[in-house]
Amino acid sequence: NSSSPNEELLYRYTHPVGSGAWVLDTAESGSQQIVLRRRPDYHLTKPDGSPLYAVDTIKFILYQESNVAIYALLKGHIDVLDTSVSSNYLLLFAKEKDLFISNAPGTFTQTLVFNLNPVSSERNPVRNLLADAEFRQAMALAINQEELIKNVLDGAGERASAGLMRPSLTDFYNPEADKLLPEDYEARLALANSILDRIVPEKDASGYRLLNGQRITFKILGSPGEQDVVSFLQIQFKKIGIDVQYAAKGAQPESTYLYTSKFDLTLQGVIFSLSNVDIMFPAHFTTLGRSSNYGRLVNDKLNQAIEEMRYTLNLNRKYELLKQIQPMIAQEYYKVPLYTSNVISVARTDRFTGYQVVEGATVFNSASLQNLRRVEGR
């Protein structure tokens, strides 16, 4: 990762050490492509003793822009897109022949993060409202995940749990985290407005709530590609009299805004699973400073549960604690889920078939590589 590697580092870059199924072809690899060759002595095989993977050579063609890569795929210059693309491309792909579209369930949950505990120098009367859990609850009630999935993802997504654990992780997903708020959206709006009528009852002529005579407006940090999300959140939050606006987060949002409490709300993607909770739960909910706990949440009971979950050697107890933690996360209304987006990727079928759909993965995955077969005559 050095921009000016010395001779020793250069040698290591071009002579990697590993035990995988393919090895780097240094003679054919360069700045525009990476070539891997299947190693004949790979230890895993199929039951009949044949190679586990059917692909002899993999060439990664490096493109700087996704639209160029998509054009190359449609023209037949490459076989597979090794990246997830926007759901906006689904209609385009559906019109093309010889394409396999993988619309796989995702593992990435988009959340709306509240700056509930900014450093003292970044506090102001409007931002102080976010310190009130009831105020955050009211905003959470106004979020309609189904509408976001329909309009932002073109239907290519699923509802996300308030406990931020995927329901497909059946061993430790806790459905109780999703029973804290009413299911019916109209009932949710009524409850949200009743809460806010107590906290900030005054409104302007447009129906937006006021604090000290000024409209309550929050800015949501996001990337240019997330402006659609903010636009539909504007519509939803207007129903409870709260104004939100998009704010570009720039190239280094952590240093510029997030680590320094210089934000109201921000969009943040999270992925939690058994393999990462020991590290990611503290980073998102416990650690202050330069961590993913952007809103600087402090909850001693939650912290204690996370700490015990990390260090217990009893797997049953770990699962039990994971189930206890999810409603605690949900009750904070700190990282409120918006949706879980599908992983959309595509491959050509005129040269190879046998592509597999795998949760959380693009079509370029281990299962596909094990099942690929060349089309007869090609």
Annotate each language-model stretch with its function.
Residues 133-137, 141, 149-152, 185, ...:
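Extracytoplasmic/peripheral linker and loop segments enriched in polar/acidic and small residues
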Residues 25-37, 61-122, 146, 150-152, ...:
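Extracellular/periplasmic solute-recognition and catalytic clefts
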Residues 347-378:
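Long beta-strand-rich cores associated with HINT superfamily self-processing modules
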Residues 18, 22-23, 159-204, 222-227:
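Structural transition elements
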Residues 8-13, 42-92, 234, 243-251:
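Ligand-site clamp/hinge motif
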Residues 29-31, 64-65, 72, 169, ...:
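Ligand/substrate-recognition segments at binding pockets and active sites
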Residues 1-52, 57, 68, 189-190, ...:
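Gly/Pro-rich hinge or "lid" segments in bacterial periplasmic/extracellular proteins
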Residues 105-121, 163, 253-311:
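Acidic-aromatic pocket-rim loops
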